[in-house]
Amino acid sequence: MSATTWSASFGGIAGSDLEAELAQARTVDHDANEAADLEHAEATHHHARVAAQGHARGDAQPPAGALARDDGRRAADYSVQLRGVGKRYGEREVLSGFDLSIERGSFVAIVGRSGCGKSTLLRLVAGLEKATSGVLEKRNEEGGPLDTRIMFQDARLLPWKSVLQNVMLGLGRSAREDARAVLAEVGLLERANDWPAQLSGGQRQRVALARALVHRPQLLLLDEPLGALDALTRIEMHALIERLWREHRFTALLVTHDVHEAVALGDRILLIEEGRIALDQPVPLARPRARASAGFAALEEHVLQRVLKTAPNDDALSDGAYDARDEGRARRPTDVRWAV
C-alpha cells in the first residue's frame, strides 16, 4: 500500500512504567479539557456580544439554536467516512449500505462473528480493496490524503533482515535514528540487531507495531493483531497500544473477536451483523480501564450478549441500554457470564 512517509521524531520512552505514563496522560487530558472549556466559554461570550451589537443596530437575528448547530458542525471532525458503502464478491454481498463516521483521534473497536464483514471493512478503509458501491472518504486535518498503516495478526517480518532493518523497510538510511527511537518506545531497542527468529510472538508484534508507527500514521488499522498471543502478553500489548495511541493521537480502528479486548481499548464498540452495524456502543469507562470493576464486566456482558443474541431484550441493548451509573452497583456472580 502506497502512503506518504513522514519524518518521525519520537521521545526515548521505553515503556518501563506504563501505569505512571498513563496517569500522566490522564493529567494532560484533564488540562486539555479545562482549556477546551475555557475556549468554549470565550466563544460563547463572543457570540453573545456580536448578537447584542446586531440587535442594537436592528440586524436580523439567526434562529434560536443556529449558533449551537454551527458549533456542532465545526466540532464534528471525521478522519474516515463511509456512506452507503457496499462490497460484493461475485454473488455474495458482504457489506450493504454501510454508513460509518470515525472521529479523528478516536479508538474504535469492531466485533462480530466470523464472516460478518469486519476484515472486509478494514481492507476497504486501508485501500487494499475497492468498494462495489457507495463513497469512502479519508482525509487529514487539512483535507489531504490520510497516511494509513495496517497491522495484521501475523507480524510479517522478513527473516533475513534484522529487527532494525524490518522497522526501516521502505525508508532511507536517514530514518535509522527514527527507527531506533520507535523501537525504544516499544521496549525493544536492545534487540535492534537480532533476527526475527530470535524473538517471541509478542516481541515480533511489537516490531510490527514499531514498523507502522515509524511512519507517524494518522490512521492505524489493527486486524486482530493480538489473536495468536497468550493472555498475559495480550494484556501487556493492550497497555502498550493504548499508551502509544494516547501519546501520538492517531485514529485507531481495531477488528477483534475478543469482546474483552474491545472494551479494554475502544472509545466505541461497533457490532457488525450481516454486513451492517447492529450495535454502536460508546465505552463510558475511564482510562486506564479497571478490568476487575463491575462497570467493565457489565459492559463486556452487555456487548457479549448482543453478539451471541442471548440478551432478554435485543432492541433495548441495541438502543444503548447500558448505563455507566450501574458501574458501582452490586452484582451477583450469577449476573455475569464470562467469556472463556
UniProtKB/Swiss-Prot annotation:
It comes from Paraburkholderia xenovorans (strain LB400). The lineage of its organism: Bacteria, Pseudomonadati, Pseudomonadota, Betaproteobacteria, Burkholderiales. GO terms for cellular component: plasma membrane. Residues 80-299 form the ABC transporter domain. ATP binds at G112, R113, S114, G115, C116, G117, K118, S119. InterPro entries: AAA+_ATPase, ABC_transporter-like_ATP-bd, ABC_transporter-like_CS, ABC_transporter_ATP-bind, P-loop_NTPase. It is a peripheral membrane protein. It is found in: Cell inner membrane. This is Aliphatic sulfonates import ATP-binding protein SsuB 1. Belongs to the ABC transporter superfamily. Aliphatic sulfonates importer (TC 3.A.1.17.2) family. The keyword Secreted does not apply. GO terms for molecular function: ATP binding; ATP hydrolysis activity. PROSITE patterns: ABC_TRANSPORTER_1, ABC_TRANSPORTER_2, SSUB. Residues 44-72 are annotated as: Disordered. SUPFAM superfamilies: P-loop containing nucleoside triphosphate hydrolases.
